[in-house]
Amino acid sequence: MRINYCENGCMLYYKDYIDLESCKFCQRAHFRKAPSGKKVDVKAMHYLPLIPRLKRLYASNRSAPHMRWHHENRRPPGVMCHPSDGEAWKHFDRKYPEFAAEPRNIRLGLCSDGFTPYSVSAAPYSCWPVYLTPYNLPPEMCMTSPYIFLNCIIPGPLNPKIMIDVYFQPLIDELNQLWIERVETFDVSLKQNFNLWAVLMWTISDFFAYGMLSGWMKTGKLACPYCMENTKSFTLKHGQKNCWFDCHRRFLPMDHEFRNMKNEFRNNTVDRDCPPPIYTREQVWERAQHFPKVTEEQPYKFDGYGVAHNWTKQSIFWELSYWKDHLLRHNLDPMHTEKNYFDNLFNTVMDVNDKTKDNIKARMDLPEYCR
């Protein structure tokens, strides 16, 4: 499925706007004239519909019997080998028992990240594929190539940043259809029709994409999406980088010995602070709903950005009526977390040229904050 979009990534020429001659935000032309005189679209993205592929999972004997695995193969308490063992899955079951009553209803995870499709020496080009995975399947099938569905490719050459929501509109429409209207599907393993219900459980990304998807930008002192404005981060005097050193003692029990150590963490500092409040799902939605969507307004910096909050938009995922009821909406993938940590540690210990964190400015900052 080919969908035209604005040259600047402001909007899709989709649904009510399919016949517009120019972008409703920046007024860039929808079409250009080819040498033959024919009108040609300026930019287009490719979208692969989700619903037909979900229905095909039940049309094949290779996958249909396994789509009930999460329900039929229960693990003992305390054993976790599948997302269905997690509290977020169980919380959703308790919140929507009618959905949980039909084990064939599908739960999905969304993953996206940017990559450069050309050689490193070529001109910079950022391309963003979006993948969806059904979690009904057993672990040995869940993350294999046949069941990781490419949903769309957000073309480059520029990073979409917070405008990534523009390209998610067809997906959100399908997810709403799967939740509100449901889709009649034939289950070949049980030889019967049923109304398929599907839910997007969470997103998985690196920290930068987390900010693009959630609407809480991951830059500056307020980068942490849990501490929010209650963070204890500070800016290094010489390195001028945001630092979260010694921000974690506040999470320890009040009588923990680390809290009273004056010189083992920040110099001459004890920590008597309580952990930051954990906002409920309702409180997060109460904050997010006051910000506009990038599909409705051009983005701009809101009052207090970087000081009182880091909101850049209302994420398009809030259009899913169940999104506010999720216990866990966004996840960090372990590959980026582990690799980045290891790279920094290894390069510093081994003093890798141009990659070590042990530089002159770091040496100047050490006596400022450490004994």
Enumerate the predicted regions with their spans.
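Domain-level cores of phosphate- or acyl-group-handling catalytic modules
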Residues: 1-371
